[in-house]
């Protein structure tokens, strides 16, 4: 155990952080990672209490003696410096009353996190000791380098996938599911909103599985515990979006049961209008035998019931999905079941691919491969039905006034999107020019648009 910070009369004005590291080698590695990240972001490390702008204390809570030593170290840091962030095993320990032990003994600490929490520690450091941004020196903005327009951005929350769909080789390329630490995700989201992003598109290979690999481990954000789980993450992102008047849109939502918990957030309460009533759910097919061969969830009737229940709770819900037509062994009757599902579910936006073998996919070994012309004919027929359903749903929006995010401004007015439209893959709204110069639209702003027309894909409207 080491506490190398001592008092000296050498005050420094630069952003400097002191580090007290206690506990086992695993805790020492955590401290090394924190220091590495601090240095990577331009902070300096102070060897004295009074030479530091704040102090991070990495604690141990394994045995009573270690608990007391950690509490004493926190007290010393508070007395010598006054600004203290606490991390490590003791951060997760409760007192006899059930509250956090550290907060009860030392209520003046700035923030408390658990172990393995580099992201949470850095978020706390940023909150209490912001790193000055010098545009002449710093090459990378806090939000990172983005290839999307300034007003929307993608937020990847995990990598890899635990499914073994027979038509897919993603797990062999990207590996098993690895969820990003929840504080790291939240920090990136906050930086994006601060940079002017008005729409955050949450993506992964399987958004619904977020946190499964870490058993929904509890992290910390803004001084409060936050589970590494989709439901809790969406709620926290929605709260953050509300602070900045922004949107959160969910993509690649595999229809696990806990997805039902998200729907009320979209329909009511303070998150309504921020967690968008939009789900991108990759159903892929509707016949149980085909789904079984795909190694997908096979209870299509249950899925249809859930879709209908979602719409009862949230009538404005937009559902986008993707499907595969002509999968090996798909019969005419099974394909008709798929078309019936599209009609009954009234999906708003769909894409369909004619099945095509992918090198390395287990589906290549399935019997019943269909000729190319049959696969393509089924894809075309599917899209005919899907477009009929979509056109009918879009037509219901005529006469309504909708919130539109402007993506482009030109001589003909503006082009934007509603809550029902993700960029690049869904429709757009063509907005007539503003009547007055002072009312001209700006890219990245929200405007209220009265819908005056529609086709099978896009809308037209006026302010």
From Swiss-Prot:
Q: Does the keyword Iron-sulfur apply?
A: yes
Per the UniProt entry, the Enzyme Commission number(s) are 2.8.4.4
**Cofactor(s) for this protein?**
[4Fe-4S] cluster
Keywords from UniProt, A to Z, are:
4Fe-4S, Cytoplasm, Iron, Iron-sulfur, Metal-binding, S-adenosyl-L-methionine, Transferase
Q: Main subcellular localization, coarse class?
A: cytoplasm
Q: Where are the transmembrane segments?
A: none
Residues that coordinate or bind [4Fe-4S] cluster 2: 161, 165, 168
Location of the Radical SAM core domain? 147-392
Q: Which reaction does it catalyse?
A: L-aspartate(89)-[ribosomal protein uS12]-hydrogen + (sulfur carrier)-SH + AH2 + 2 S-adenosyl-L-methionine = 3-methylsulfanyl-L-aspartate(89)-[ribosomal protein uS12]-hydrogen + (sulfur carrier)-H + 5'-deoxyadenosine + L-methionine + A + S-adenosyl-L-homocysteine + 2 H(+)
Q: Name one GO cellular component term.
A: cytosol
The protein's enzyme class: transferase
Recorded coiled-coil stretches: none
Where do the annotations place [4Fe-4S] cluster 1 binding?
24, 60, 89
Please give the function described in this protein's UniProt entry: Catalyzes the methylthiolation of an aspartic acid residue of ribosomal protein uS12.
Name of the featured protein:
Ribosomal protein uS12 methylthiotransferase RimO
- List the source organism: Burkholderia mallei (strain ATCC 23344)
């Amino acid at each position: 155990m080491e506490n190398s910070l001592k008092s000296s009369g050498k005050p420094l004005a630069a952003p400097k952080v002191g580090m007290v590291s206690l506990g086992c080698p695993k805790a020492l590695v955590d401290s090394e990672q924190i220091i590495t990240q601090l240095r990577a972001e331009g902070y300096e490390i102070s060897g004295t209490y009074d030479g530091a702008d704040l102090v991070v204390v990495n604690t141990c809570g394994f045995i009573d003696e270690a608990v007391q030593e950690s509490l004493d170290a926190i007290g010393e840091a508070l007395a010598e410096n006054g600004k203290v962030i606490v991390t490590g095993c003791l951060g997760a320990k409760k007192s006899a009353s059930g509250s956090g032990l550290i907060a009860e003994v030392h209520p003046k600490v700035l923030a408390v996190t658990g172990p393995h929490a580099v992201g949470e520690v850095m978020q706390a450091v940023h909150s209490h000791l912001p790193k000055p941004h010098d545009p002449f020196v710093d090459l990378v903005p806090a939000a990172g380098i983005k290839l999307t327009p300034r007003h929307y951005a993608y937020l990847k929350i995990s990598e890899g996938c635990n499914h073994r769909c027979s038509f897919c080789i993603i797990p062999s390329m990207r590996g098993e599911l690895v969820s990003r630490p929840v504080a790291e995700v939240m920090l990136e989201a906050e930086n994006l909103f601060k940079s002017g992003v008005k729409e955050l598109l949450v993506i992964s290979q399987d958004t619904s599985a977020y946190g499964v690999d870490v058993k929904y481990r509890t992290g910390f954000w803004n001084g409060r515990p936050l589970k590494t789980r989709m439901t809790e993450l969406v709620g926290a992102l929605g709260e953050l979006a509300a602070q900045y008047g922004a949107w959160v849109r969910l993509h690649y939502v595999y229809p696990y049961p806990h997805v039902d918990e998200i729907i009320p957030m979209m329909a009511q309460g303070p998150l309504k209008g921020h967690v968008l009533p939009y789900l991108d759910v990759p159903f892929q097919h509707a016949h149980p035998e085909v789904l079984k061969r795909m190694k997908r969830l096979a209870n299509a009737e249950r899925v249809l019931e859930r879709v209908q229940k979602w719409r009862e709770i949230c009538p404005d819900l937009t559902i986008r999905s993707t499907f595969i037509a002509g999968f090996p062994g798909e019969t005419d009757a099974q394909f008709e079941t798929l078309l019936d599902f599209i009609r009954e579910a009234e999906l708003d936006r769909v894409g369909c691919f004619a099945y095509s073998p992918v090198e390395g996919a287990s589906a290549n070994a399935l019997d019943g491969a269909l000729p190319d012309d049959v696969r393509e004919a089924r894809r075309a027929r599917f899209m005919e039905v899907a477009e009929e359903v979509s056109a009918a749903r879009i037509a219901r929006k005529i006469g309504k006034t909708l919130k539109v995010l402007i993506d482009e401004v030109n001589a003909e007015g503006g082009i934007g999107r509603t809550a029902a439209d993700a960029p690049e893959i869904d429709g757009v709204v063509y907005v007539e020019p503003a009547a007055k110069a002072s009312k001209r639209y700006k890219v990245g702003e929200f405007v209220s648009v009265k819908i005056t027309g529609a086709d099978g894909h896009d809308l037209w409207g006026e302010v």
